[in-house]
Every structure is written in structure tokens, then in C-alpha cells.
Amino acid sequence: MDIIKIALTGGPAGGKTSVLNAIKELSVNDVDSKYKNIIHLNGKKIKLITVPETATELISNGITPVEANNVYDFQNILFGVQKSKEELVEQAVSFGYDADMCLFIYDRGLLDGRAYLNSKEEFERLVTENGMEELEILDQYDLVIDLLSTATCLPQKYSLENNKARFEEAEWAKSIDYLTSTAWVGHRNLKLFRSDIPLQKEIDQVINHIKDYITYGIKDNQEKYLIETDPDDFYQYTNENSRTIQVNNKYMNFGLPSYLDTILIKRTYRDYSTYFLQVVSNRSNKSVVIGDQKIDEATYSELLNKNEVIDEVTKTELSFIENNHLFKVSFYEDFTTLEFDRDDVLSLEELPKDVRIIEKLDGSLDKFLKNKEKVLKKEKSMLI
């Protein structure tokens, strides 16, 4: 059975509760079987399992951060409970549901605790003490939906709502919102949704995004630019407000048609690596990921040893939030690119500081870069 794991996150009053309720309303109790919470989508039967917010459960039942020895101790308990919940509920797949897919929706994920601790270093300590790695956590979710707080997008509308576990004031809520978003930067499929639109429109956007992901997989919805810059221009992005991940893409010969790229992906952060096998269709100047599977290191090595490497692309990805937008800057050997969500309408003033655009890139980014890399290597060889 296929499994999709989605973390639903965001700052206070971002619409998370309303979105989660709307997702639940998509499901029905299947009259043809004993199974409940079934979503019917494009001929597929999808078993929906939602995992409630751990912080609200703890606080509402008497375990509060203000009563703890310190915030770290509370977050450590929260992390442990959340980790156990995720591991246990995922065992439900073994129940043998009469469905094509199991969809897990987590009301907040394991990285959310970063927003409530004093520093990134403190969160790294918490992760280590719980026997995990940040990249391991980041890459265990297939999709991350970040609902920006109205404190960020529409401050005048922000107000405390009737959730007894919510106690953030507006300015603090804005700070928490930013730190929450920053905790998830570097995720392969992170999507930010603004709350300065009617709530129903925001809900519809999220629902459609989830449906598209289930139906079509990862869609290339990034605006891409070749930029002139220097790594030193990004000195303001540190471990506290960004994430830098080393990415190696090996293009393999698996005997598939020429319009399909089979890629072995290795992502490395703080000396820990995760691995993926991805199949990308390149037709009509469009790239669509039609297969994306997380694999272990042994499988990665086996596929690498048994198949021919056609090409290889290595880059350093710097991901960060600025002006409430998600940016990714990729540093290659001889050039640099900037990416952001095509749904974002950005002015020049909203682009990262010191970024100078050379040209817009269309179509497959990696294909463009591989070709450009070959040209640059040829030019270098002619100079020798």
C-alpha cells in the first residue's frame, strides 16, 4: 500500500484547525466495507488517518510549559510523545485496509518544537538526545504545508481565538510563525500558504494542493533564475535562520525511454545523509516527477553499483524565509540559481538582498544546468 505523510504546520491563527477539519470532511465511512474515513479521489480509495496536535493535548490535560522546570524540559516531553505517536499510528498500515493508499495528516510535526526553544543549538541537542537527526526528521514527511499566521500576513485581523491552549500575543505569534517556517526550510516539498485571503479560499488552496500531490506527485512549480552573486553575499543566513543541504544527483541508465530521467539523490546535512530514487518525465519543456521513493543507504549503493551513471550534478542548497516567502539558492561549481514558488507574486524589493538576476530559466532546471556545465567545462579545456 502506498503511504503519504503530510505535516500540517504554521503559526497561531493560520487556519490550521479549519483546514484539518476540511480535510476530514473529504472522507466518508465506506458503505461497502467496515473501514471508516475513506477518501475517494480519481478512482482511488484513500484511507485517511489524522494525528492530533500533541502540544494541545498536553496543555489541555494539565502538562504546561509554564509549570515545567524550563521550556526545554516541556519540549523534550512533547517531542518524545510526538515521536512515539507517529511511530505507533504508522503501524496501523498493517491492519490491511481496503484502500489503495494510506494518507497520514499530522497536526504539527517533530520540527515544530524549534520555534519554542531559545536557539537552534538547543533544538539540535533535543533532537540528538532523542536519538534522531534533523535531516532524518525533515525527510520522513512527504509534504509539508505551512499556514502562515494572520499575525504575519494580516496583523490587524489577528486575535486570540477560543483555543484554551493558545496564549500567544500578536508580536510573539509573528515571531513563532517565522521560527516555525524556518524550522522546515530545506524540505523537498514545503509549501507556504498565506492567511491574508478569505479563509475558505485558503482551505480550497490547501485541499487542491493535497489532491494534486496525491494525483500527480511532485509538480515543478518553481520560478527559476540564473543569478549573479557570491556565497559571501548571504552571510546573514546562518544556522539559526536557514538550512544548507548538500545535494548530489546521479542520473542513471535504467533502460527507460529518453524522456525519462532516473535519478539517485543523496542529501547531506550535518554529516547525515538521506537517499531517494526519483523518476522525472521531461516532455513539452515541462518536468514532472512521476516517481519518488525514499530508500536506504544499502539500496542506494546497490542501485549505484548495478547501473551506469550517465551524468552527475552536485549543488549546495541554501533555503530560507524572507519577506514571508520561501527562497532556495543553489550554488553549483560555476553558477548560482534562485528559486521560489511560482504562485508568489514578488516585486524586486522582496527578492533577497544583493541578488542580481541574469536570466529566467524555463523547463527542466537540471537539464539546463547539466548542459551549461558541459559548456563551461569545454570552455575551460580550450583555455588550458
Model-predicted segments: where are they?
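P-loop (Walker A) phosphate-binding loop of NTP-binding proteins
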Residues: G11
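Phosphate-end processing signature that detects enzymes handling 5′-triphosphorylated RNA
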Residues: N208, Y213-I384
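Hydrophobic positions on the alpha1 helix immediately C-terminal to the Walker A/P-loop
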Residues: V19
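Conserved lysine of the Walker
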Residues: K16
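NTP-dependent small-molecule kinase module
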Residues: D2, W172, Y178-T229
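A glycine- and Lys/Arg-enriched "phosphate-lid" helix/loop adjacent to the NTP-binding pocket
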Residues: K120-T182, G217
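Conserved substrate/cofactor phosphate-moiety recognition/catalytic segment
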Residues: K24-K83
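Conserved nucleotide-sensing/catalytic segment adjacent to the nucleotide-binding pocket
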Residues: G62-E124
